[in-house]
């Protein structure tokens, strides 16, 4: 039995998230369907670095699976690329040690959120970015983001549905890239993220850019450890990308 690590990208628009769910189309289900077919009906389970929600995309999701087939990683990559739908891409496949674990071995992740700042709605980007036709002061967003850097209890910045007991996470950096006059990308790097955390942080920073909240409001929300204390809305899923997963 050999363990394989794969880096995949996918367009989340047509999936009900990554994780297998009954009677719905998910990324995991499509990959496991292809692997099971390759293994002549024997079920093959796939483990990912983490789940993504309905409509969320991935540029660098990492998965692992075990196989007893005597084929090279390169052939696995080619076969899976052919046997999975066009909205999933296998960027790399490689053999890894048996103790590699896509989920428990992570030491950091990067998420990016794409904001389209056009006055007129662009129907061709509706599934891949948030349309935000309002004025934004990027300098205010950067000031606000500094209050979030470091180790904090992010209870106020995650969904009440978060299953983790500890809400303490470390944010290494938040960077802002103005790719052109219309596109703002916010990049979040940290040792881990809670359910809806990046989308809530994005909504908070957008409010800061409009002057609705101040850096002090963010500090107070962190100390309050109560999602109800924060007025910012959760940004919608379509602008969010799992960009990269890091391992030791």
From Swiss-Prot:
Biological processes annotated in GO: tRNA pseudouridine synthesis
Gene3D superfamilies tied to this protein: Pseudouridine synthase I, catalytic domain, C-terminal subdomain (3.30.70.660), Pseudouridine synthase I, catalytic domain, N-terminal subdomain (3.30.70.580)
EC id: 5.4.99.12
Keyword Heme: no
Residues the record marks as active site: 53 (nucleophile)
GO MF annotations, alphabetized: pseudouridine synthase activity; RNA binding; tRNA pseudouridine(38-40) synthase activity
Positions that bind substrate: 111
Enzyme class, spelled out: isomerase
Protein keywords: Isomerase, tRNA processing
Protein family according to the UniProt entry: Belongs to the tRNA pseudouridine synthase TruA family.
Biological role stated in the UniProt entry: Formation of pseudouridine at positions 38, 39 and 40 in the anticodon stem and loop of transfer RNAs.
Known partners and oligomeric status: Homodimer.
Stored PANTHER family: PSEUDOURIDYLATE SYNTHASE, TRNA PSEUDOURIDINE SYNTHASE-LIKE 1
Protein name: tRNA pseudouridine synthase A
Native source organism of the sequence: Listeria monocytogenes serovar 1/2a (strain ATCC BAA-679 / EGD-e)
Chain's gene name: truA
